[in-house]
């Protein structure tokens, strides 16, 4: 193992331009002093390794783990896969009264919006039911009852990136951060007034305590939102200057099944449908009658917000869905076992990989840069590869659903609109792995895993400089042989 502490890199690479340039880039960055860097570069055409540095050393991948999850999901679930949400009734209907229960059964859809619940409520109304003399029951038994991935830390459970996973869930908008609400915080009418808070979806399932104040236009903007650990009570504190732009904060909810069920109950009320009984959770009986089904977008469409925006919840849903579809058990244990088996069959060495979740949020995940470039190489031969490639963020493209997490990186360079790669960030970890085409049209696969740095300033610049340099080259692969 080699640390970047000013020592020369491997002598075998010193005489080659790629090694010299990458050495220069990493050596010039004080942020990498005492840190680890795993770098792997391959020919996209042949898979030949043309450069590696500590590329066999296992490192934390952060959200580069999503590259494995997406590939396994496409291979196992297929491009036609959709998630269904089903509406059932059980009982006797007399005129417009249902003497019985309504069941909302979730099957993992992480993209359910308020408008989708509205659509299901309209389907219920079309049954000429306006009064339910019984209960409204949410069924999330498609998956197991473990809502958090194995290594998630307690403090992350309130954050959108650590939201609880459920087979029945709701998202606030078309970024599809399932299991969250969106709080939009704007300045009040004048200094001294409370900030104005709007919530999507608007629901009383979450209580908001607004302590944020409006300050003069030249004041400091400092808004903080915290949620009680085991209650859906969110407290907003801090200051927001007059005339400043709205602050948007996604916050995870406690009990996402109950959240989705409450949003659906509100949709029923919009349709004039009342429920006399309780709102609770349970299993849909076999004798219940299905009256409506909502289908999600297809898997390739879902991969766009998943990969572009690096949506952790989507990753964990896909893991559970793989377990459910192939093994009948919607659990992390089953899903990860199946994913690892399929990735092995694709040509990866999963014995060398520690895969603890689907998103990469775990600090225990481990993979080498060479194994990531190996995956990106073998994926090219799959029929689903165009969907996989399309889901990757594109450098310097502002449209969120194209550029994603690379939208503001490598602007006005040879990498702009060229580099397609997955980013990754957790504490002391920054990663970038994907594809780039050189100036002369050569396809390059790269993985840059940076671990154990103390300051993150300049870390992404290292990755960007390497990717840009690759994009600028002519006849790179020929010159490196």
Residue ranges of model-derived segments:
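N-terminal secretory targeting signals
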Residues: 1-29, 188-193, 199-202, 213, ...
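Beta-lactamase-like hydrolase cores
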Residues: 2-46, 51-58, 118-127
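Soluble non-cytosolic domains of exported or imported proteins
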Residues: 12-16, 20, 60-68, 77-78, ...
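Conserved serine DD-peptidase/penicillin-binding transpeptidase domain
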Residues: 26-27, 81-332, 337, 341-346, ...
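Short beta-strand scaffold segments in enzyme catalytic cores
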Residues: 39-41, 85-87, 433
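Short connector loops/turns at beta-strand edges and beta->alpha or beta->beta junctions
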Residues: 44-46, 239-243, 311-312, 438-441, ...
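Active-site SXXK
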Residues: 47, 61-79, 136, 168, ...
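Small-residue-rich helix-loop
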Residues: 50-52, 113, 319, 323-481
């Amino acid at each position: 193992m080699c640390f970047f502490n000013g020592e020369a890199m491997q002598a075998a690479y010193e005489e080659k331009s790629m090694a010299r340039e990458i050495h220069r880039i990493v050596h010039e960055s004080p942020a990498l002093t005492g840190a680890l860097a795993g770098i792997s570069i391959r020919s996209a055409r042949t898979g030949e390794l043309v450069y590696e540095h500590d590329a066999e050393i296992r490192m934390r991948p952060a959200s580069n783990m999503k590259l494995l999850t997406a590939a396994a999901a496409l291979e196992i679930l297929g491009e036609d896969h959709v998630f269904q949400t089903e509406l059932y009734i059980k009982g006797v209907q007399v005129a417009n009264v249902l003497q019985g229960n309504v069941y909302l059964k979730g099957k993992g859809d992480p993209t359910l919006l308020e408008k989708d619940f509205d659509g299901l409520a309209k389907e219920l109304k079309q049954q000429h039911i306006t009064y339910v003399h019984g209960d409204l029951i949410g069924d999330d038994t498609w998956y197991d009852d473990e809502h958090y991935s194995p290594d998630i830390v307690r403090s992350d459970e309130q954050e959108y990136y650590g939201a609880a996973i459920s087979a029945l869930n709701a998202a606030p908008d078309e970024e599809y951060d399932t299991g969250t609400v969106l709080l939009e915080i704007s300045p009040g009418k004048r200094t001294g007034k409370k900030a104005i808070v709007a919530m999507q979806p608007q629901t009383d399932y979450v209580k908001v305590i607004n302590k944020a104040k409006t300050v003069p236009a030249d004041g400091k903007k400092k808004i903080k939102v915290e949620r009680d650990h085991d209650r859906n009570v969110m407290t907003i504190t801090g200051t927001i200057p007059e005339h400043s732009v709205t602050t948007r904060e996604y916050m995870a909810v406690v009990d996402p099944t109950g959240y989705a069920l409450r949003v659906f109950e509100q949709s029923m009320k919009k349709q004039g449908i009342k429920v006399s009984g309780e709102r609770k959770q349970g299993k849909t009986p076999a004798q219940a009658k299905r009256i409506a089904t909502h289908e999600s977008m297809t898997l390739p469409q879902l991969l766009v917000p998943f990969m572009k925006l690096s949506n952790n919840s989507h990753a964990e849903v896909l893991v559970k869905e793989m377990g459910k579809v192939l093994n009948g058990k919607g659990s992390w244990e089953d899903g990860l076992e199946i994913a690892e088996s399929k990735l092995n069959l694709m040509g990866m060495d999963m014995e060398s990989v520690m895969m603890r979740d689907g998103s990469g949020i775990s600090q225990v995940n481990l993979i080498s840069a060479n194994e990531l470039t190996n995956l990106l190489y073998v994926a090219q031969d799959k029929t689903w590869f165009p969907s996989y490639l399309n889901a990757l963020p594109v450098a310097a493209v502002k449209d969120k659903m194209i550029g994603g997490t690379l939208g503001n990186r490598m602007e006005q360079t040879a990498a702009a609109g060229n580099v397609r790669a997955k980013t990754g960030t957790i504490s002391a970890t920054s990663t970038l792995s994907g594809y780039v085409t050189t100036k002369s049209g050569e396809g390059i696969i790269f993985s840059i895993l940076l671990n154990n740095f103390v300051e993150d300033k300049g870390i992404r610049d290292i990755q960007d400089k390497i990717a840009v340099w690759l994009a600028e080259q002519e006849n790179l692969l020929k010159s490196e042989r």
